[in-house]
From Swiss-Prot:
The gene is accD. Component of the acetyl coenzyme A carboxylase (ACC) complex. Biotin carboxylase (BC) catalyzes the carboxylation of biotin on its carrier protein (BCCP) and then the CO(2) group is transferred by the transcarboxylase to acetyl-CoA to form malonyl-CoA. It catalyses: N(6)-carboxybiotinyl-L-lysyl-[protein] + acetyl-CoA = N(6)-biotinyl-L-lysyl-[protein] + malonyl-CoA. Residues 191-212 are annotated as: Disordered. The lineage of its organism: Eukaryota, Viridiplantae, Streptophyta, Embryophyta, Tracheophyta. It comes from Chloranthus spicatus. Binds 1 zinc ion per subunit. One of its GO terms (cellular component) is chloroplast stroma. Residues 226-497 form the CoA carboxyltransferase N-terminal domain. InterPro entries: AcCoA_carboxyl_beta, Acetyl_CoA_COase_Trfase_b_su, ClpP/crotonase-like_dom_sf, COA_CT_N. This is Acetyl-coenzyme A carboxylase carboxyl transferase subunit beta, chloroplastic. Acetyl-CoA carboxylase is a heterohexamer composed of biotin carboxyl carrier protein, biotin carboxylase and 2 subunits each of ACCase subunit alpha and ACCase plastid-coded subunit beta (accD). Zn(2+) binds at C230, C233, C249, C252.
Length: 502
């Protein structure tokens, strides 16, 4: 285990504030920023390093630890995993964490620390800084420059070791204005495989209470307000920036699920969205009996949690100035299942577009027909298909279907596959019956990847696969190719009417 010495040139107060370590000079806080209040993880009265405990301010602290030292070899420190601290009594400890093996270790080998201190003094007196090809004389001239450089190194260390972005605000002594986010105890989580991490100690006089941490699922829930974990590469994406990235993983480019509100914002010009039938709600038409939760109560619960009235939002707006009618399904509302209200809203949308002669976009994300409404939900397939037939074949208008993940069941068997142009998102799960249903029904194994968009594309099931970034531009070009133009280019015609319908 390599250990690097820290120099006390750093100001305690500035170190605490700028690294977000603590609010007092007597405490050493975390390299991290989380939420909530949890049980203590470590207790050690002998070393006077008391419990690591979560606080409402988003930091945890170890009382009576005085400060980090400094670094003798700053470039070697970046890839190291051990830090040395000294408590208020002048006693030194080495703090080690192994991210890969999820180990947190504290040691107080006094002989080793004394040897290091002697080596460090010799290092400075011999002028080793001049031999370092990375050394910048100005960098070490002032305490302020040291702090800035140390901040940069801590940031680089976390980026390289934890594989996530961290953010450090320098030049401010205000604790609330400076922060650093990291995820010390977990890195790449592999799907359903759950591993438990532990905290252990070394040293003859150590008396720590070791508590095994929760599994990956619980840990990810705890940090869910800060990070979004990619379903494909399991890397973490900072939640505050994730929406601006269109829910696309910055590491691997995987398209994660997107709610209907974000999709509307992505596709529709700002200030042009006008919802339709947003007050229409389900009324439990067959009085579905459930041992767990009544259907109406379940609907109410989803309405409170999502802010939606049903699993689809319909309305009119403009896409790059072109008037359109659009329906966007939301998988967060009962899995985007299609009930009588969903079918009615989509049917009314298509009928409105037929009367106004404007193009229709349907963004599909659904698990299929809603079982709580029985055959009434299956009837919606025929009702929507009938309205679509009149719109497409009789009126010669243009319908675009966008298949997102997942699109299955009755939606796949009806309006999802009826578009004049059928667009799929990359790696979207598109099928009629899900993998589990097929395997349990036919007792056969469904090959991996046989129900993703790329496989179906090569079989000719739909037209292009379009990522979210260029989607709006692609739709705009398709509409203009089929005779629909922005209002300012088609002032002589009615709202985006077809100029060339044949």
């Amino acid at each position: 285990m390599e250990k690097w010495w820290f120099n006390s040139m750093l100001s305690n107060e500035e170190l605490e504030h700028r690294w977000g370590l603590s609010k007092s000079m007597e405490s050493l806080g975390p390299i991290g920023n989380t939420r909530g209040s949890e049980d203590p993880i470590i207790n050690d009265t002998d070393k006077n390093i008391h419990s690591y405990s979560w606080s409402d301010s988003g930091s945890y602290s170890c009382s009576n630890v005085d400060h980090f030292f400094g670094v003798s070899d700053i470039w070697s420190f970046i890839s190291d995993e051990t830090f040395l601290v000294r408590d208020s009594n002048g006693k030194g400890y080495s703090v080690y964490f192994d991210i890969e093996n999820r180990i947190f270790e504290i040691d107080n080998d006094s002989s080793f620390l004394s040897e290091l201190e002697s080596s460090f003094s010799s290092y400075l007196s011999n002028g080793s800084k001049n031999d370092n090809r990375y050394y910048d004389s100005y960098m070490y001239d002032t305490k302020y420059s040291w702090n800035n450089h140390m901040n940069s190194c801590i940031d680089s260390y976390l980026r390289s070791e934890i594989s996530i972005d961290s953010y450090i605000s320098t030049g401010s002594d205000n604790f609330s204005d400076s922060y650093i986010y990291s995820y010390i105890f977990s890195e790449k989580v592999s799907g359903s495989d759950s591993e438990s991490s532990s905290i252990r100690t070394s040293g003859n006089d150590s008396n720590f209470n070791v508590r095994e941490r929760d599994n990956d699922f619980d840990r990810n829930q705890k940090y869910g307000r800060l990070w979004v974990q990619c379903e494909n590469c399991y890397e973490l994406n900072y939640r505050s920036f994730f929406r601006s990235k269109m829910n696309i993983c910055e590491q691997c480019g995987y398209h994660l699920k997107m709610n209907s509100l974000d999709r509307i914002e992505l596709s529709i010009d700002s200030g042009t969205w006008n919802p339709m039938d947003d007050d229409m709600v389900s009324m439990d038409p067959i009085e579905f009996h459930s041992m767990e939760e009544p259907y109406r109560d379940r609907i109410d619960s989803y309405q409170r949690n999502t802010g939606l009235t049903e699993a689809v939002q319909t309305g009119i707006g403009q896409l790059n100035g072109i008037p359109i009618a659009i329906g966007v399904m939301d998988f967060q509302f009962m899995g985007g299942s299609m009930g009588s209200v969903v079918g009615e809203k989509i049917t009314r949308l298509i009928e409105y577009a037929t009367n106004e002669s404007i193009p229709v976009i349907m963004v599909c994300a659904s698990g299929g027909a809603r079982m709580q409404e029985g055959s009434l939900s299956l009837m919606q397939m025929a009702k929507i298909s009938s309205a679509s037939y009149n719109y497409q074949l009789n009126k010669k208008l243009f319908y675009v279907s966008i298949l997102t993940s997942p699109t299955t069941g009755g939606v796949t068997a009806s309006f999802g596959m009826l578009g004049d142009i059928i667009i799929a998102e990359p790696n979207a799960y598109i099928a009629f019956a899900g993998k589990r249903v097929i395997e349990q029904t036919l007792n056969k194994t469904v090959p991996d990847g046989s129900q993703v968009a790329e496989y179906s594309f090569h079989k000719g099931l739909f037209d292009p696969i379009v990522p979210r970034n260029p989607l709006k531009g692609v739709l705009s070009e398709l509409f203009q190719l089929h005779g629909f133009f922005p209002l300012n280019q088609n002032s002589s015609g009615a709202r985006g009417s077809v100029i060339c319908s044949e």
